[in-house]
């Protein structure tokens, strides 16, 4: 019984993201983020994610963050993530540690995150709104490399390129078949 009942699909998802950090003092800050995720790149809803957190800069190379996210997921694609083809809400608590270092002109970061996900589900097809929110635990690890496209370091308004790989692993009682949840690989341009 080494087989897995996982279904793989390919979707054209557009992710549009706002991220802001507001420094409150030398050590504390506020992280804000909104992700507008669309199916068929932009034409249909896929997901809305609002995340806020409190940052604590332990030292120049170690950032700690704890926070909350509110996620609304809509049915999309050939096989909706929710078996009833309905939207659902997720309430998520998270804790994060990010370690940073520099080698030459390359900025490296390693992000370790724990998430406690309370994912809405319907106990039966007859209920109109999610009535159960079981706890799903997830660990995330991301490595990111960032290189300035001009100059020797990334400052405000410096163009840069970044590469990242993030692995998601579920654990605990309600995980079922999705222990290895996701692997996100990306290339970013920014300034």
Task: State what each model feature region is.
Residues 34-40, 68-74, 101-103, 114-118, ...:
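Transmembrane beta-strands of outer-membrane beta-barrel pores
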Residues 30-32, 64-66, 106-112, 139, ...:
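Transmembrane beta-strands of outer-membrane beta-barrel proteins
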Residues 4-6, 36-40, 80-84, 126-133, ...:
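Extracellular loop and loop/strand-boundary signature of outer-membrane beta-barrel proteins
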Residues 26-27, 61, 102-109, 149-159:
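Short loop/turn motifs that connect adjacent beta-strands in outer-membrane beta-barrel proteins
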Residues 18-22, 52-56, 95-101, 114, ...:
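Residues on the lipid-exposed face of transmembrane beta-strands in outer-membrane beta-barrel proteins
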Residues 10-14, 46-48, 89-93, 133-141, ...:
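Residues that define the transmembrane beta-barrel architecture of outer-membrane proteins
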Residues 3-67, 71-74:
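Start-of-domain marker
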Residues 81-139:
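Hydrophobic, well-structured mid-protein blocks that either form specific transmembrane helices
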């Amino acid at each position: 019984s080494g087989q897995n009942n996982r279904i793989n699909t390919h979707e054209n998802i557009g992710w549009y993201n706002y991220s802001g950090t507001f420094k409150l003092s030398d050590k504390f800050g506020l992280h804000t983020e909104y992700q507008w995720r669309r199916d068929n790149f932009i034409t249909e809803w896929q997901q809305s994610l609002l995340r806020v957190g409190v940052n604590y800069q332990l030292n120049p190379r170690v950032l700690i963050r704890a926070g909350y996210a509110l996620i609304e997921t809509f049915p999309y694609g050939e096989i909706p993530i929710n078996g009833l083809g309905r939207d659902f809400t997720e309430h998520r608590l998270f804790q994060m540690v990010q370690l940073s270092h520099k080698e030459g002109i390359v900025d490296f970061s390693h992000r370790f995150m724990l998430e406690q996900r309370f994912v809405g589900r319907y106990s039966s097809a007859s209920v109109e709104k999610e009535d159960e929110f079981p706890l799903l635990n997830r660990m995330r690890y991301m490595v990111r490399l960032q290189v300035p496209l001009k100059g020797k370091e990334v400052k405000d308004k410096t163009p840069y390129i970044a590469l990242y790989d993030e692995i998601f692993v579920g654990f605990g009682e309600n995980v079922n078949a999705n222990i290895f949840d996701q692997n996100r690989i990306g290339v970013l341009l920014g300034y």
